[in-house]
Amino acid sequence: MMSVRLMLVVAVWLCLRVDASQDVMKNLSMNFAKPLEDCKKEMDLPDSVTTDFYNFWKEGYEFTNRHTGCAILCLSSKLELLDQEMKLHHGKAQEFAKKHGADDAMAKQLVDMIHGCSQSTPDATDDPCMKALNVAKCFKAKIHELNWAPSMELVVGEVLAEV
């Protein structure tokens, strides 16, 4: 009887952790994308970039447009998440994650995932936008593996609430 209770407590805790993680990822995504319109104007990016961001967490949605990678770089720069070499600044990225709901462990895990994706994707030295796009694809896959991707209903609800 005690082991059944323990299993139930663990199962409930894991479900709450996943829901909390999805909520944090929703907050991070919404705040990361706030300067998107500025980046689109500054870089003359097409509306397809907005579509990619809108569908970013949708499972099975493939984004291949290098302009989306350029937008990711622009957003990261505007949010001061990059160092002088245009690489992720781990400390600032962890602070950004914590500011938007992640605890220390989750913030570190997110930055470690992005760093791992950056290391595992081939360098496109002649095209930093494609490198950013490939890192984003890898990161998205890792978030889905953890079941941390926010539901589309949550994201759409937030977007509609801000309009």
UniProtKB/Swiss-Prot annotation:
Might you name a Gene Ontology BP term for this protein? response to pheromone
InterPro entries in the record:
Odorant/phero-bd_Lep, PBP/GOBP, PBP_GOBP_sf
Disulfide bond positions: 39-74, 70-129, 117-138
Q: Is Glycoprotein among the key words of this record?
A: no
Q: Tissue specificity, please?
A: Antenna.
| A GO term for molecular function | pheromone binding
Q: Fetch the SMART domains from UniProt.
A: PhBP
Keyword Transport present in the record's keywords: the answer is: yes
Stored CDD domains: PBP_GOBP
Q: State the superkingdom.
A: Eukaryota
Q: Which family does it belong to?
A: Belongs to the PBP/GOBP family.
Main function: This major soluble protein in olfactory sensilla of male moths might serve to solubilize the extremely hydrophobic pheromone molecules and to transport pheromone through the aqueous lymph to receptors located on olfactory cilia.
Q: Which protein is depicted?
A: Pheromone-binding protein
- Source species, please? Heliothis virescens (Tobacco budworm moth)
Q: Which taxonomic lineage is given here?
A: Eukaryota, Metazoa, Ecdysozoa, Arthropoda, Hexapoda
